[in-house]
Amino acid sequence: MPGWSCLVTGAGGFLGQRIIQLLVQEKDLEEIRVLDKVFKPETREQFFNLGTSIKVTVLEGDILDTQYLRRACQGISVVIHTAAIIDVTGVIPRQTILDVNLKGTQNLLEACIQASVPAFIFSSSVDVAGPNSYKDIVLNGHEDEHRESTWSDPYPYSKKMAEKAVLAANGSMLKNGGTLQTCALRPMCIYGERSQFLSNTIIKALKNKFILRGGGKFSTANPVYVGNVAWAHILAARGLRNPKKSPNIQGEFYYISDDTPHQSYDDLNYTLSKEWGFCLNSRWYLPVPILYWLAFLLETVSFLLSPIYRYIPPFNRHLVTLTASTFTFSYKKAQRDLGYEPLVSWEEAKQKTSEWIGTLVEQHRETLDTKSQ
């Protein structure tokens, strides 16, 4: 394949950084453009110390700035779009999430058409498929089953509509007369080193005598390691650039999981952290149906107060459903079309993540020592 270039949005994020680490190992890649609204100084330094001859261009800009996006896409061969706001708690205003996740994706697609970028890979989410009810049971689901989230909550709704826009754009004519090829990847819940969600869980537990706060004990999920999700993006980029593979990939979506055992979210957190003395909360939990209707009441209160006060419920029906459902998916289609096999085994993923949790524990101890002096 001739020399090529790649733009990665959300490159400063949890998944984006891992994609960059794998991209620098790709043959014939001449330039990587890393785009985010703001990069932490340590992330910038990491990009400049990748030890590669590939040109790395750091771009800070707003995904809602259409002119900026068009300039960022000039001369690019592949766009990997991971930039998104992930929030299932209701903390971030709805319009902000819709602007970034949906409008931002639409802006980027238009920039690709105007700049004649031939390949677009969208980091979607399993949330676009549901679960719609905690009563539903989906084990090893697959792409041939028609599953679509019916939630109006901003995160699943915005990701669903953004994915629809991406797949609908497949086959669009580019400004130079070429054709845009798109695909979407739907990873399961992602874990691994530097996961903000996992970090928050551990930090809360450190302040709670190493007791992990529960909430997902009734779930059955198949979480996926961040390194394997990043690998799937690399394979999708290769596939869309390969004339023999591309016809089977363009316009398609793929569930991305790995060989992490099916388990509850609580069990996953415990398995990854038990080496450092963490334990599960043994308290009694309300039955899921009661939690669900309590969430409905809290959402009603929030709605009634909205004209005069922004009340954010501690949990909502969507969150209860996510953490109480049996919802797992197979990666066989990605295996068939992309040649995807997990790059990192469950044992290795568990070890790497556990070691990282150990660094969080050490940082916490150092903070306590400093305060006690």
UniProtKB/Swiss-Prot annotation:
GO terms for biological process: steroid biosynthetic process. Pathway: Lipid metabolism; steroid biosynthesis. Belongs to the 3-beta-HSD family. Its EC number is 1.1.1.145, 5.3.3.1. GO terms for molecular function: 3-beta-hydroxy-Delta5-steroid dehydrogenase (NAD+) activity; steroid Delta-isomerase activity. Keywords: Endoplasmic reticulum, Isomerase, Membrane, Mitochondrion, Multifunctional enzyme, NAD, Oxidoreductase, Steroidogenesis, Transmembrane, Transmembrane helix. Pfam families: 3Beta_HSD. Coiled coil: none annotated. GO terms for cellular component: endoplasmic reticulum membrane; mitochondrial inner membrane. This is 3 beta-hydroxysteroid dehydrogenase/Delta 5-->4-isomerase type 3. It catalyses: a 3beta-hydroxy-Delta(5)-steroid + NAD(+) = a 3-oxo-Delta(5)-steroid + NADH + H(+); a 3-oxo-Delta(5)-steroid = a 3-oxo-Delta(4)-steroid. NAD(+) binds at residue 159. Gene3D superfamilies: NAD(P)-binding Rossmann-like Domain. It is a single-pass membrane protein. It is found in: Endoplasmic reticulum membrane; Mitochondrion membrane. The chain crosses the membrane at residues 288-308. Signal peptide: none annotated. Liver and kidney. Greater expression in liver. 3-beta-HSD is a bifunctional enzyme, that catalyzes the oxidative conversion of Delta(5)-ene-3-beta-hydroxy steroid, and the oxidative conversion of ketosteroids. The 3-beta-HSD enzymatic system plays a crucial role in the biosynthesis of all classes of hormonal steroids.
